[in-house]
Protein backbone atom coordinates (compact mmCIF):
# COMPACT_ATOMS: atom_id res chain seq x y z
CA UNK A 1 0.00 0.00 0.00
CA UNK A 2 1.62 3.25 -1.15
CA UNK A 3 0.62 6.58 0.32
CA UNK A 4 2.19 10.03 0.31
CA UNK A 5 1.84 10.52 4.05
CA UNK A 6 3.30 8.82 7.08
CA UNK A 7 0.98 5.89 7.63
CA UNK A 8 1.20 3.63 10.64
CA UNK A 9 -0.81 0.58 9.76
CA UNK A 10 -1.27 -1.28 12.96
CA UNK A 11 -3.80 -3.97 12.30
CA UNK A 12 -5.73 -3.29 15.52
CA UNK A 13 -7.91 -1.87 13.58
CA UNK A 14 -29.35 23.66 8.74
CA UNK A 15 -25.93 24.77 9.70
CA UNK A 16 -25.02 28.17 11.10
CA UNK A 17 -21.44 28.97 11.94
CA UNK A 18 -18.19 30.50 10.86
CA UNK A 19 -16.70 30.11 7.42
CA UNK A 20 -15.02 26.75 6.87
CA UNK A 21 -11.30 26.71 7.47
CA UNK A 22 -8.55 26.62 4.90
CA UNK A 23 -7.54 23.00 4.39
CA UNK A 24 -4.09 21.92 5.55
CA UNK A 25 -2.92 20.01 2.52
CA UNK A 26 0.73 19.01 2.28
CA UNK A 27 2.60 16.44 0.24
CA UNK A 28 3.74 14.81 3.48
CA UNK A 29 1.12 15.60 6.14
CA UNK A 30 2.19 14.66 9.66
CA UNK A 31 -0.40 12.01 10.47
CA UNK A 32 -0.33 8.54 12.01
CA UNK A 33 -2.92 6.06 10.74
CA UNK A 34 -3.85 2.89 12.63
CA UNK A 35 -6.16 0.08 11.62
CA UNK A 36 -8.59 -1.14 14.24
CA UNK A 37 -10.36 -4.48 14.31
CA UNK A 38 -13.67 -5.43 15.89
CA UNK A 39 -13.95 -8.34 18.28
CA UNK A 40 -17.03 -10.01 19.74
CA UNK A 41 -18.04 -9.66 23.37
CA UNK A 42 -20.36 -12.43 24.56
CA UNK A 43 -22.14 -10.11 26.99
CA UNK A 44 -21.58 -6.49 25.91
CA UNK A 45 -23.40 -4.95 28.88
CA UNK A 46 -21.41 -6.96 31.42
CA UNK A 47 -18.25 -6.20 29.50
CA UNK A 48 -19.03 -2.48 29.40
CA UNK A 49 -19.58 -2.47 33.14
CA UNK A 50 -16.42 -4.43 33.76
CA UNK A 51 -14.27 -2.21 31.57
CA UNK A 52 -15.88 1.17 32.28
CA UNK A 53 -13.40 2.91 34.47
CA UNK A 54 -13.69 5.50 35.28
CA UNK A 55 1.81 17.75 8.18
CA UNK A 56 1.69 15.37 10.80
CA UNK A 57 -0.92 12.44 11.30
CA UNK A 58 -0.81 8.80 12.44
CA UNK A 59 -3.44 6.35 11.14
CA UNK A 60 -4.22 2.99 12.73
CA UNK A 61 -6.61 0.44 11.30
CA UNK A 62 -9.12 -0.96 13.76
CA UNK A 63 -10.25 -4.58 13.85
CA UNK A 64 -14.01 -4.83 14.21
CA UNK A 65 -15.64 -7.96 15.61
CA UNK A 66 -19.05 -6.50 16.34
CA UNK A 67 -18.81 -5.22 19.90
CA UNK A 68 -15.21 -4.26 20.65
CA UNK A 69 -12.37 -2.55 18.81
CA UNK A 70 -8.76 -3.64 19.02
CA UNK A 71 -5.47 -2.36 17.70
CA UNK A 72 -2.14 -4.14 17.49
CA UNK A 73 1.02 -2.52 18.80
CA UNK A 74 4.45 -3.68 19.91
CA UNK A 75 6.39 -2.77 23.03
CA UNK A 76 10.02 -3.18 23.98
CA UNK A 77 13.30 -4.20 22.41
CA UNK A 78 12.98 -6.69 20.81
CA UNK A 79 9.34 -6.07 19.95
CA UNK A 80 6.60 -7.81 21.93
CA UNK A 81 3.21 -7.92 20.20
CA UNK A 82 0.01 -6.95 21.99
CA UNK A 83 -3.62 -6.53 21.01
CA UNK A 84 -5.24 -3.73 23.01
CA UNK A 85 -8.78 -2.37 23.31
CA UNK A 86 -8.93 1.11 21.80
CA UNK A 87 -10.61 3.40 24.30
CA UNK A 88 -11.41 7.09 24.01
CA UNK A 89 -13.00 6.93 27.48
CA UNK A 90 -9.73 6.39 29.35
CA UNK A 91 -6.21 7.74 29.17
CA UNK A 92 -3.68 5.10 30.21
CA UNK A 93 -2.18 2.40 28.04
CA UNK A 94 -1.85 -0.70 30.16
CA UNK A 95 -1.15 -4.36 29.49
CA UNK A 96 -0.75 -7.55 31.46
CA UNK A 97 2.65 -8.70 32.63
CA UNK A 98 3.64 -12.07 31.20
CA UNK A 99 4.11 -13.44 34.73
CA UNK A 100 0.94 -11.87 36.14
CA UNK A 101 -1.42 -13.91 38.27
CA UNK A 102 -3.97 -14.02 35.48
CA UNK A 103 -1.66 -14.75 32.55
CA UNK A 104 0.09 -17.51 34.51
CA UNK A 105 -3.16 -19.38 35.18
CA UNK A 106 -3.70 -22.80 33.65
CA UNK A 107 -6.03 -21.76 30.83
CA UNK A 108 -3.59 -19.03 29.66
CA UNK A 109 -6.25 -16.37 29.03
CA UNK A 110 -3.70 -13.78 27.87
CA UNK A 111 -2.62 -15.71 24.79
CA UNK A 112 -5.08 -13.96 22.46
CA UNK A 113 -4.22 -10.40 23.45
CA UNK A 114 -0.60 -10.94 24.39
CA UNK A 115 1.40 -9.82 27.40
CA UNK A 116 4.53 -7.82 28.18
CA UNK A 117 7.71 -9.15 29.79
CA UNK A 118 9.87 -6.28 31.11
CA UNK A 119 12.83 -8.58 31.73
CA UNK A 120 12.95 -9.41 28.01
CA UNK A 121 13.26 -5.78 26.88
CA UNK A 122 16.59 -3.96 26.85
CA UNK A 123 14.81 -0.59 26.62
CA UNK A 124 12.57 -1.11 29.68
CA UNK A 125 12.84 1.22 32.67
CA UNK A 126 10.89 1.17 35.94
CA UNK A 127 9.05 4.38 36.85
CA UNK A 128 6.91 3.69 39.92
CA UNK A 129 4.52 1.23 41.53
CA UNK A 130 1.62 3.67 41.28
CA UNK A 131 -0.34 1.91 38.56
CA UNK A 132 -3.63 0.77 40.05
CA UNK A 133 -6.89 0.93 38.15
CA UNK A 134 -10.23 -0.21 39.53
CA UNK A 135 -13.54 -0.53 37.71
CA UNK A 136 -17.06 -0.09 38.99
CA UNK A 137 -17.66 -3.80 39.60
CA UNK A 138 -14.42 -4.26 41.55
CA UNK A 139 -12.31 -5.62 38.70
CA UNK A 140 -9.10 -3.93 37.66
CA UNK A 141 -5.34 -4.19 37.52
CA UNK A 142 -2.41 -3.19 39.70
CA UNK A 143 1.31 -3.04 39.08
CA UNK A 144 3.96 -0.64 37.85
CA UNK A 145 4.29 2.36 35.65
CA UNK A 146 7.21 1.77 33.30
CA UNK A 147 8.74 3.30 30.20
CA UNK A 148 9.74 1.47 27.04
CA UNK A 149 9.71 1.87 23.29
CA UNK A 150 6.32 1.63 21.61
CA UNK A 151 6.02 0.80 17.93
CA UNK A 152 2.70 1.72 16.38
CA UNK A 153 2.68 0.93 12.71
CA UNK A 154 5.63 2.69 11.11
CA UNK A 155 6.19 5.11 13.99
CA UNK A 156 8.28 4.72 17.12
CA UNK A 157 8.09 6.54 20.44
CA UNK A 158 10.93 5.92 22.88
CA UNK A 159 10.65 6.21 26.67
CA UNK A 160 6.87 5.93 26.49
CA UNK A 161 5.10 5.55 29.85
CA UNK A 162 2.42 2.90 30.39
CA UNK A 163 1.02 0.59 33.05
CA UNK A 164 1.94 -3.06 33.56
CA UNK A 165 -0.56 -5.20 35.46
CA UNK A 166 1.00 -7.86 37.68
CA UNK A 167 -2.36 -8.45 39.34
CA UNK A 168 -5.29 -8.25 36.96
CA UNK A 169 -8.78 -9.55 36.28
CA UNK A 170 -8.93 -8.76 32.56
CA UNK A 171 -6.99 -10.54 29.84
CA UNK A 172 -7.48 -7.53 27.56
CA UNK A 173 -5.13 -4.59 27.90
CA UNK A 174 -6.33 -1.09 27.06
CA UNK A 175 -5.03 1.67 24.81
CA UNK A 176 -6.54 4.75 26.45
CA UNK A 177 -6.25 7.92 24.37
CA UNK A 178 -8.29 10.42 26.38
CA UNK A 179 -7.30 13.52 28.33
CA UNK A 180 -4.16 13.19 30.46
CA UNK A 181 -6.20 14.58 33.37
CA UNK A 182 -8.02 11.22 33.39
CA UNK A 183 -4.83 9.20 33.91
CA UNK A 184 -4.75 6.99 36.99
CA UNK A 185 -1.81 8.72 38.64
CA UNK A 186 -3.58 12.07 38.21
CA UNK A 187 -7.08 11.10 39.30
CA UNK A 188 -6.16 8.71 42.11
CA UNK A 189 -2.87 10.09 43.42
CA UNK A 190 -3.04 13.74 42.42
CA UNK A 191 0.29 13.55 40.63
CA UNK A 192 1.26 15.40 37.48
CA UNK A 193 0.16 13.98 34.15
CA UNK A 194 2.53 12.18 31.82
CA UNK A 195 2.45 12.22 28.02
CA UNK A 196 0.02 9.47 27.01
CA UNK A 197 -0.04 8.24 23.41
CA UNK A 198 -1.59 11.23 21.57
CA UNK A 199 0.44 13.71 23.61
CA UNK A 200 3.61 11.66 23.12
CA UNK A 201 3.04 11.73 19.36
CA UNK A 202 2.93 15.53 19.49
CA UNK A 203 5.99 15.65 21.72
CA UNK A 204 7.94 13.45 19.30
CA UNK A 205 6.91 15.43 16.21
CA UNK A 206 4.76 12.69 14.69
CA UNK A 207 1.68 14.92 14.61
CA UNK A 208 1.20 18.66 15.02
CA UNK A 209 -1.79 18.76 17.32
CA UNK A 210 -3.23 16.58 20.07
CA UNK A 211 -6.20 15.56 17.95
CA UNK A 212 -7.42 12.49 16.08
CA UNK A 213 -10.38 11.28 14.04
CA UNK A 214 -12.22 7.98 14.43
CA UNK A 215 -13.94 6.00 11.66
CA UNK A 216 -15.34 2.66 12.84
CA UNK A 217 -17.22 1.83 9.62
CA UNK A 218 -20.43 -0.19 9.70
CA UNK A 219 -21.44 -3.23 11.75
CA UNK A 220 -20.61 -5.61 8.93
CA UNK A 221 -17.09 -4.29 8.37
CA UNK A 222 -14.08 -6.05 9.84
CA UNK A 223 -11.93 -2.95 10.18
CA UNK A 224 -12.00 0.79 10.68
CA UNK A 225 -9.29 3.32 11.40
CA UNK A 226 -8.11 6.03 13.72
CA UNK A 227 -6.11 8.89 12.26
CA UNK A 228 -3.90 10.77 14.71
CA UNK A 229 -3.25 14.37 13.71
CA UNK A 230 -5.57 14.46 10.71
CA UNK A 231 -8.95 13.97 9.07
CA UNK A 232 -9.91 11.84 6.08
CA UNK A 233 -12.51 13.73 4.06
CA UNK A 234 -13.48 10.59 2.12
CA UNK A 235 -14.85 8.96 5.28
CA UNK A 236 -17.80 11.25 5.97
CA UNK A 237 -20.73 13.01 4.29
CA UNK A 238 -21.25 16.76 4.30
CA UNK A 239 -19.28 19.06 6.56
CA UNK A 240 -17.78 18.59 9.99
CA UNK A 241 -19.52 20.70 12.64
CA UNK A 242 -17.68 21.62 15.81
CA UNK A 243 -19.03 21.59 19.37
CA UNK A 244 -17.40 22.45 22.71
CA UNK A 245 -16.48 19.65 25.09
CA UNK A 246 -18.09 20.05 28.52
CA UNK A 247 -16.01 20.13 31.68
CA UNK A 248 -16.46 17.82 34.67
CA UNK A 249 -16.15 19.82 37.89
CA UNK A 250 -14.44 22.55 35.91
CA UNK A 251 -11.84 20.24 34.36
CA UNK A 252 -11.57 18.84 30.83
CA UNK A 253 -11.25 15.15 31.54
CA UNK A 254 -13.73 13.27 29.32
CA UNK A 255 -15.27 13.66 25.86
CA UNK A 256 -18.66 14.93 27.01
CA UNK A 257 -20.92 16.99 24.76
CA UNK A 258 -24.57 18.11 24.92
CA UNK A 259 -27.23 15.88 23.35
CA UNK A 260 -30.25 18.04 22.56
CA UNK A 261 -32.58 15.75 20.63
CA UNK A 262 -33.45 12.11 19.91
CA UNK A 263 -36.06 10.85 17.47
CA UNK A 264 -37.20 7.62 15.83
CA UNK A 265 -38.55 7.56 12.30
CA UNK A 266 -39.72 5.19 9.61
CA UNK A 267 -41.42 5.61 6.25
CA UNK A 268 -44.80 5.89 7.96
CA UNK A 269 -44.17 7.46 11.37
CA UNK A 270 -41.99 9.82 13.38
CA UNK A 271 -41.49 9.87 17.15
CA UNK A 272 -39.70 12.84 18.69
CA UNK A 273 -38.34 12.48 22.23
CA UNK A 274 -36.77 15.95 22.38
CA UNK A 275 -39.45 17.22 24.77
CA UNK A 276 -38.26 14.77 27.40
CA UNK A 277 -37.20 16.27 30.72
CA UNK A 278 -33.98 14.27 30.27
CA UNK A 279 -32.83 16.58 27.45
CA UNK A 280 -30.54 18.31 26.94
CA UNK A 281 -28.24 15.70 28.43
CA UNK A 282 -24.52 15.33 28.93
CA UNK A 283 -23.30 12.36 26.87
CA UNK A 284 -19.89 10.73 26.80
CA UNK A 285 -18.35 9.65 23.48
CA UNK A 286 -16.70 6.34 24.38
CA UNK A 287 -15.29 3.82 21.90
CA UNK A 288 -14.68 1.46 24.81
CA UNK A 289 -18.42 0.98 25.36
CA UNK A 290 -20.03 -1.56 23.06
CA UNK A 291 -23.56 -0.19 23.46
CA UNK A 292 -25.23 3.21 23.80
CA UNK A 293 -26.59 4.19 27.21
CA UNK A 294 -29.31 6.87 27.14
CA UNK A 295 -31.45 8.44 29.89
CA UNK A 296 -34.02 5.98 31.21
CA UNK A 297 -37.11 7.91 30.10
CA UNK A 298 -35.90 8.14 26.51
CA UNK A 299 -35.02 4.45 26.43
CA UNK A 300 -38.47 3.63 27.80
CA UNK A 301 -40.10 5.55 24.94
CA UNK A 302 -37.89 3.92 22.31
CA UNK A 303 -38.56 0.47 23.75
CA UNK A 304 -42.31 1.11 23.77
CA UNK A 305 -42.31 2.32 20.17
CA UNK A 306 -40.15 -0.54 18.88
CA UNK A 307 -41.47 -3.28 21.14
CA UNK A 308 -38.13 -4.06 22.78
CA UNK A 309 -38.04 -6.79 25.44
CA UNK A 310 -35.97 -5.67 28.43
CA UNK A 311 -34.36 -8.48 30.43
CA UNK A 312 -33.62 -6.94 33.82
CA UNK A 313 -31.18 -9.55 35.14
CA UNK A 314 -28.72 -8.88 32.32
CA UNK A 315 -29.65 -5.26 31.69
CA UNK A 316 -30.11 -5.95 27.98
CA UNK A 317 -32.90 -5.13 25.54
CA UNK A 318 -33.81 -7.76 22.93
CA UNK A 319 -35.56 -7.46 19.57
CA UNK A 320 -36.38 -9.88 16.76
CA UNK A 321 -33.33 -10.06 14.51
CA UNK A 322 -35.64 -9.35 11.58
CA UNK A 323 -35.97 -5.77 12.85
CA UNK A 324 -32.64 -5.04 11.16
CA UNK A 325 -34.39 -5.32 7.79
CA UNK A 326 -36.81 -2.49 8.56
CA UNK A 327 -36.40 1.06 7.26
CA UNK A 328 -36.11 2.72 10.67
CA UNK A 329 -33.65 5.35 11.87
CA UNK A 330 -32.69 6.79 15.25
CA UNK A 331 -31.59 10.41 14.93
CA UNK A 332 -29.41 12.27 17.43
CA UNK A 333 -29.20 16.07 17.48
CA UNK A 334 -26.36 18.06 19.06
CA UNK A 335 -27.58 21.68 18.84
CA UNK A 336 -26.96 21.71 15.06
CA UNK A 337 -25.19 18.48 13.96
CA UNK A 338 -27.57 15.60 13.26
CA UNK A 339 -26.29 12.02 13.23
CA UNK A 340 -28.57 9.33 11.80
CA UNK A 341 -28.20 5.72 12.96
CA UNK A 342 -29.92 3.04 10.90
CA UNK A 343 -31.75 0.32 12.81
CA UNK A 344 -29.48 -2.28 11.18
CA UNK A 345 -26.58 -0.75 13.16
CA UNK A 346 -28.48 -1.32 16.41
CA UNK A 347 -29.42 -4.99 16.05
CA UNK A 348 -26.58 -7.16 17.34
CA UNK A 349 -26.19 -10.91 17.02
CA UNK A 350 -26.93 -12.78 20.26
CA UNK A 351 -26.06 -16.26 19.03
CA UNK A 352 -28.79 -18.90 19.25
CA UNK A 353 -31.02 -16.99 21.66
CA UNK A 354 -34.69 -17.14 20.65
CA UNK A 355 -38.04 -15.80 21.76
CA UNK A 356 -40.67 -18.29 22.86
CA UNK A 357 -42.42 -17.94 19.51
CA UNK A 358 -39.26 -19.25 17.81
CA UNK A 359 -38.06 -15.95 16.37
CA UNK A 360 -34.32 -15.29 16.69
CA UNK A 361 -33.53 -12.71 19.36
CA UNK A 362 -30.85 -10.05 18.91
CA UNK A 363 -29.43 -7.53 21.35
CA UNK A 364 -30.71 -3.99 20.88
CA UNK A 365 -27.86 -1.49 20.88
CA UNK A 366 -29.46 1.10 23.19
CA UNK A 367 -29.91 0.42 26.91
CA UNK A 368 -30.77 2.52 30.00
CA UNK A 369 -27.99 4.57 31.58
CA UNK A 370 -29.45 4.34 35.07
CA UNK A 371 -27.89 6.94 37.36
CA UNK A 372 -24.68 7.18 35.32
CA UNK A 373 -23.79 9.73 32.67
CA UNK A 374 -25.24 8.76 29.29
CA UNK A 375 -22.73 7.12 26.94
CA UNK A 376 -22.65 7.12 23.15
CA UNK A 377 -20.79 3.89 22.51
CA UNK A 378 -19.99 1.91 19.40
CA UNK A 379 -23.63 1.50 18.33
CA UNK A 380 -23.63 5.28 17.83
CA UNK A 381 -20.01 5.87 16.86
CA UNK A 382 -20.15 3.53 13.86
CA UNK A 383 -22.54 5.99 12.23
CA UNK A 384 -20.54 9.11 13.07
CA UNK A 385 -17.19 10.43 11.91
CA UNK A 386 -15.76 12.04 15.04
CA UNK A 387 -12.78 14.36 15.42
CA UNK A 388 -11.48 14.59 18.99
CA UNK A 389 -9.56 17.86 19.34
CA UNK A 390 -7.97 17.72 22.78
CA UNK A 391 -5.85 20.80 22.12
CA UNK A 392 -8.91 23.02 21.64
CA UNK A 393 -11.38 21.02 23.78
CA UNK A 394 -13.75 20.46 20.87
CA UNK A 395 -15.55 17.64 19.07
CA UNK A 396 -16.33 17.79 15.35
CA UNK A 397 -19.08 15.53 13.96
CA UNK A 398 -20.38 14.37 10.60
CA UNK A 399 -22.35 11.39 9.32
CA UNK A 400 -20.01 8.59 8.40
CA UNK A 401 -19.51 7.34 4.86
CA UNK A 402 -19.74 3.57 5.20
CA UNK A 403 -17.31 1.28 3.38
CA UNK A 404 -15.42 4.09 1.67
CA UNK A 405 -12.23 2.82 0.02
CA UNK A 406 -10.94 6.26 -0.94
CA UNK A 407 -8.63 8.49 1.10
CA UNK A 408 -8.03 12.22 1.27
CA UNK A 409 -5.88 12.91 4.31
CA UNK A 410 -5.65 16.46 5.63
CA UNK A 411 -3.45 17.48 8.52
CA UNK A 412 -4.86 19.07 11.66
CA UNK A 413 -2.75 22.12 12.38
CA UNK A 414 -2.14 24.09 15.56
CA UNK A 415 -4.08 26.91 17.18
CA UNK A 416 -7.78 27.73 17.09
CA UNK A 417 -10.06 26.33 14.38
CA UNK A 418 -7.38 23.87 13.28
CA UNK A 419 -9.62 21.00 12.10
CA UNK A 420 -9.69 21.15 8.27
CA UNK A 421 -13.06 22.06 6.79
CA UNK A 422 -14.88 22.21 10.12
CA UNK A 423 -17.32 24.97 11.05
CA UNK A 424 -18.14 26.12 14.55
CA UNK A 425 -21.75 25.63 15.65
CA UNK A 426 -23.33 28.96 16.59
CA UNK A 427 -24.73 29.18 20.12
CA UNK A 428 -24.43 25.48 21.01
CA UNK A 429 -26.18 24.22 24.13
CA UNK A 430 -23.72 24.02 27.00
CA UNK A 431 -26.08 24.05 30.00
CA UNK A 432 -25.69 20.38 30.85
CA UNK A 433 -24.27 18.91 34.02
CA UNK A 434 -21.56 16.30 33.55
CA UNK A 435 -20.70 14.41 36.70
CA UNK A 436 -18.15 12.03 35.19
CA UNK A 437 -19.75 9.24 37.20
CA UNK A 438 -19.07 5.60 36.54
CA UNK A 439 -15.84 3.92 35.67
CA UNK A 440 -16.30 3.57 32.00
CA UNK A 441 -13.49 1.76 30.32
CA UNK A 442 -10.55 3.38 31.95
CA UNK A 443 -12.40 5.99 34.03
CA UNK A 444 -10.80 5.58 37.45
CA UNK A 445 -13.18 4.98 40.32
CA UNK A 446 -10.69 6.27 42.85
CA UNK A 447 -10.69 2.91 44.59
CA UNK A 448 -7.64 0.68 44.88
CA UNK A 449 -7.68 -2.65 43.10
CA UNK A 450 -6.60 -5.28 45.61
CA UNK A 451 -8.13 -8.58 44.59
CA UNK A 452 -9.16 -10.58 41.55
CA UNK A 453 -12.84 -11.55 41.58
CA UNK A 454 -13.41 -14.90 39.85
CA UNK A 455 -11.91 -14.13 36.47
CA UNK A 456 -13.07 -16.23 33.57
CA UNK A 457 -10.82 -17.53 30.83
CA UNK A 458 -11.57 -14.40 28.83
CA UNK A 459 -10.72 -12.14 31.70
CA UNK A 460 -14.34 -11.30 32.43
CA UNK A 461 -15.88 -11.15 35.85
CA UNK A 462 -19.39 -11.62 37.09
CA UNK A 463 -21.45 -8.53 36.34
CA UNK A 464 -24.17 -6.97 38.47
CA UNK A 465 -27.69 -8.21 37.81
CA UNK A 466 -28.71 -5.07 35.95
CA UNK A 467 -28.16 -1.36 35.48
CA UNK A 468 -28.38 0.78 38.60
CA UNK A 469 -31.78 2.24 39.31
CA UNK A 470 -33.40 1.22 36.04
CA UNK A 471 -37.20 1.40 36.20
CA UNK A 472 -38.68 -2.06 36.59
CA UNK A 473 -41.41 -1.28 34.05
CA UNK A 474 -38.78 -1.54 31.34
CA UNK A 475 -39.17 -5.29 31.74
CA UNK A 476 -42.36 -5.08 29.69
CA UNK A 477 -41.66 -4.06 26.09
CA UNK A 478 -42.20 -6.73 23.45
CA UNK A 479 -43.83 -9.20 25.79
CA UNK A 480 -47.06 -7.46 24.86
CA UNK A 481 -46.73 -8.64 21.26
CA UNK A 482 -45.59 -12.17 21.94
CA UNK A 483 -41.83 -11.72 22.06
CA UNK A 484 -40.87 -13.32 25.33
CA UNK A 485 -37.40 -14.75 25.71
CA UNK A 486 -37.21 -18.51 25.99
CA UNK A 487 -34.83 -19.42 28.82
Swiss-Prot record:
Residues 464-487 form a propeptide. It comes from Aspergillus oryzae (strain ATCC 42149 / RIB 40). Its main location: membrane. GO terms for cellular component: plasma membrane; side of membrane. Belongs to the peptidase A1 family. Its EC number is 3.4.23.-. It is found in: Cell membrane. InterPro entries: Aspartic_peptidase_A1, Aspartic_peptidase_AS, PEPTIDASE_A1, Peptidase_aspartic_dom_sf, SAP-like. It is a lipid-anchor; GPI-anchor. GO terms for biological process: proteolysis. PROSITE patterns: ASP_PROTEASE, PEPTIDASE_A1. The active site is at 87, 286. Residues 69-398 form the Peptidase A1 domain. Gene3D superfamilies: Acid Proteases. A lipid is attached at residue 463 (GPI-anchor amidated alanine). Pfam families: Asp. GO terms for molecular function: aspartic-type endopeptidase activity. Glycans are attached at residues 72, 99, 111, 132, 272, 329, 403. Residues 1-20 form the signal peptide. Keywords: Aspartyl protease, Cell membrane, Glycoprotein, GPI-anchor, Hydrolase, Lipoprotein, Membrane, Protease, Signal, Zymogen. Probable GPI-anchored aspartic-type endopeptidase. This is Probable aspartic-type endopeptidase opsB.
Amino acid sequence: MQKSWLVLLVACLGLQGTTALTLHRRDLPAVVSLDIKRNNAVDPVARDRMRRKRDKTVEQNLDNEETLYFCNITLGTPKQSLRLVLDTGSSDLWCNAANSTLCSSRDQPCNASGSYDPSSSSSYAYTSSDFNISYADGTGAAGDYVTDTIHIGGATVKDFQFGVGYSSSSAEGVLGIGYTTNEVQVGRLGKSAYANLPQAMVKNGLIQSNAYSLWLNDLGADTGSILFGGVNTEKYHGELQTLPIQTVNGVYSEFIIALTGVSLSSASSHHNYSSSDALPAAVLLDSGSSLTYLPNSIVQDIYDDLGVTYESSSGVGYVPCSLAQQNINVTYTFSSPIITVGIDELVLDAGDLRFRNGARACIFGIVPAGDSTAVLGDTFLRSAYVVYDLSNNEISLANTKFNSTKDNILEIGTGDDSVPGATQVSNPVTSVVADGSGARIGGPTGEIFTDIPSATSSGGAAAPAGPTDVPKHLVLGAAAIGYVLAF
